[in-house]
């Protein structure tokens, strides 16, 4: 089992190829993998302009808006408008998806997994006081505001806004969260596909 804090200040931003936004990679597997050879990837994306999303054949995607409003268009579907209260939006990375121009830049948590090897779950949770998250193969907990304490066994640390606690190999273990005020966290679980 490993427990690691990924500080927001250490997540460099890189512009999208189409110039319509920025991405901050939080974690990827294998370590150091790029956009063509990852097995799974979690990032923060800021959408600032209209334009198509990159396609990723064989990849399942999840996105969760942290605030604002964003409308997505997919071939053969009605447009979908997401906001800061919307549940995670799942879509295949092979599908052409375009974002309409947001009124102001919006940021989302973006999760991508190679569907033949991994599954992912993404959720927003509000904590006030104490809460627990059940660990999976990989669990990432992103704080929306300062002052979220994360603990597992002998490990403990505090998260500031957009910091992430990453826990690997703690499937079934309880990861404890504590905050002295109501705050949202985003929880990402990634699991390897098991035979049978």
Predicted regions and their residues:
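Jelly-roll (double-stranded beta-helix
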Residues: 1-196
């Amino acid at each position: 089992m490993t427990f690691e804090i990924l500080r927001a200040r250490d997540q460099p931003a890189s512009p999208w190829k189409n110039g319509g936004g920025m991405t901050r990679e939080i974690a990827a597997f294998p370590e150091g993998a790029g956009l063509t050879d990852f097995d799974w990837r979690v990032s923060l994306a800021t959408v600032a302009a209209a334009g198509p999303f990159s396609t990723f054949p064989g990849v399942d995607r999840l996105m969760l808006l942290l605030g604002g409003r964003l409308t997505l268009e997919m071939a053969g579907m009605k447009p979908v408008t997401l906001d800061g209260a919307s549940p995670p939006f799942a879509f295949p990375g092979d599908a052409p998806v375009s974002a309409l121009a947001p009124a102001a830049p919006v940021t989302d948590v973006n999760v991508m997994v190679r569907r033949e090897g991994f599954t992912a779950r993404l959720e927003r949770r509000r904590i006030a006081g104490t809460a627990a998250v059940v660990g999976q193969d990989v669990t990432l907990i992103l704080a929306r505001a300062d002052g979220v304490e994360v603990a597992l066994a002998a490990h403990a640390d505090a998260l500031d806004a957009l910091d992430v606690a990453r826990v690997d190999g703690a499937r079934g273990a309880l990861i404890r969260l504590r905050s002295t005020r109501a705050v949202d966290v985003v929880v990402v679980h990634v699991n390897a596909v098991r035979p049978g």
